[in-house]
From Swiss-Prot:
Its main location: nucleus. Pfam families: BRX, BRX_N. The gene is BRXL4. This is Protein Brevis radix-like 4. Residues 1-35, 50-78, 214-270, 304-325 are annotated as: Disordered. Residues 260-270 have a biased composition (Polar residues). Expressed in roots. The keyword Repeat applies. The keyword Nucleotide-binding does not apply. It comes from Arabidopsis thaliana (Mouse-ear cress). InterPro entries: Brevis_radix_dom, BRX-like, BRX_N.
């Protein structure tokens, strides 16, 4: 049953004593009922909380409460409040949806950068960096220091090839010099090196080798653990002086040993390695790439390079190539583990350093060469 709403009279209305049109009242009440039904059908009525302000206003107005049509007015007011709340919720949901969409548009860029950083980290061998949100992300650019030195060859001029080793601390180490047989003989090669020593050292930034800056590799052990490599320290060429004068050599050569001709001194320790260090047997052929390839019978330098399988075999060879008097005047001193020094007493009572032997177990070629450069002065002062 529809309720009737009282209508106030208008001033100056001629028909003020007559009641209002019932059709308009019925239309208003019908409209309010339709609104209530629509809200209930949409489900918004369940989520709406009663408006305290509306209740306060309804309770505070006494005439409306006592009026028989106050329930209809209250229902209209509540329906209006429900529409406002529903409209506000829809606006907030639209705003939240727009914010989520904007975040989703930004996330692919962040994720793309993060994936790119992870791929770079994986390719560089490092661990996968953390998220790109700024929490301790590792820089994907990684500089990997190589543990093993690199060897490279430079052709200084036609027929001259120099092998260098790049040092970790900077600079290069001169390892080997090769001369073409078609363009150089031994004397020409020695003269070329004496004339171009300073230029090569400066041009290729050759540094002095040290144990701290460059780890010396130890060669694999031979089958015989007592095998030793020996060379004569008195034959080691000295570093050329500034005026490049050639130093005379006076070396006593035991009879029966092979000899090489050397009128010029070779001026670098790498050349010492080529001339005075060989891991082969006694009858092995010298390397073709070495400067000490040419053999002559007129010699002032003893370059006998020998490697015996044991200490007894080494002594037997010394007996076969030396006189008995020489053996009686020679003895071996162990300076440190793996280093054996052979000393000979000359007829005048003066001592001579005949050879230094290094154990293969403790010394490689470069290690032995470096040890001799560092301890040469001490050995001469201590034993001679």
């Amino acid at each position: 049953m529809l309720t009737c709403i009282a209508r106030s009279k208008r001033a100056g209305d001629e028909s003020s004593g007559q009641p209002d049109d019932p059709d308009s009242k019925n239309a208003k009440s019908l409209t309010s009922q339709l609104k209530d039904m629509a809200l209930k059908a949409s489900g918004a009525y369940r989520h709406c909380t009663p408006c305290t302000a509306a209740q306060g206003q309804g309770q505070g107005q006494g005439p409306i409460k006592n009026n028989p049509s106050s329930s209809s007015v209250k229902s209209d007011f509540e329906s209006d409040q429900r529409f406002k709340m529903l409209y506000g919720r829809s606006n907030s949901s639209i705003t939240a949806t727009a914010a989520v969409a904007a975040t989703q548009q930004q996330q692919p860029r962040v994720w793309g950068k993060e994936m790119e950083a992870r791929l770079k980290g994986i390719s560089s061998g490092e661990a996968t960096p953390k998220s790109a949100s700024g929490r301790n992300r590792v820089d994907p650019i990684v500089f990997v220091e190589e543990k093993e030195p690199k060897e490279w060859v430079a052709q200084v001029e036609p027929g001259v090839l120099i092998t260098f080793v790049s040092l970790p601390g900077g600079g290069n180490d001169l390892k080997r010099i090769r001369f073409s047989r078609d363009m150089f003989n031994k004397l020409q090669a020695q003269r070329w090196w004496a004339d171009n020593y300073d230029k090569v050292m400066e041009l290729y930034n050759v540094q002095k080798l040290s144990r701290q800056a460059f780890p010396l590799p130890t060669p694999p052990r031979s089958e015989d653990e007592n095998a030793k490599v020996e060379y004569h320290p008195e034959d080691t060429p000295a570093t050329p002086p500034l005026n490049k004068e050639r130093l005379p050599r006076t070396i006593h050569r035991p009879p029966g040993l092979a000899a090489y001709s050397s009128s010029d001194s070779l001026d670098h320790n790498s050349m010492q390695s080529q001339q005075f260090y060989d891991s082969g047997l006694l009858n092995s052929t010298p390397k073709v790439s070495s400067i000490s390839v040419a053999k002559t019978e007129t010699s002032s330098i003893d370059a006998s390079i020998r490697s015996s399988s044991s200490r007894d075999a080494d002594r037997s060879e010394e007996m076969s190539v030396s006189n008995a008097s020489d053996v009686d005047n020679e003895w071996v001193e162990q300076d440190e583990p793996g280093v054996y020094i052979t000393i000979k007493v000359l007829p005048g009572g003066k001592r001579e350093l005949r050879r230094v032997r290094f154990s293969r177990e403790r010394f490689g070629e470069m290690h032995a060469r470096l040890w001799w450069e560092e301890n040469r002065a001490r050995i001469h002062e201590q034993y001679l």
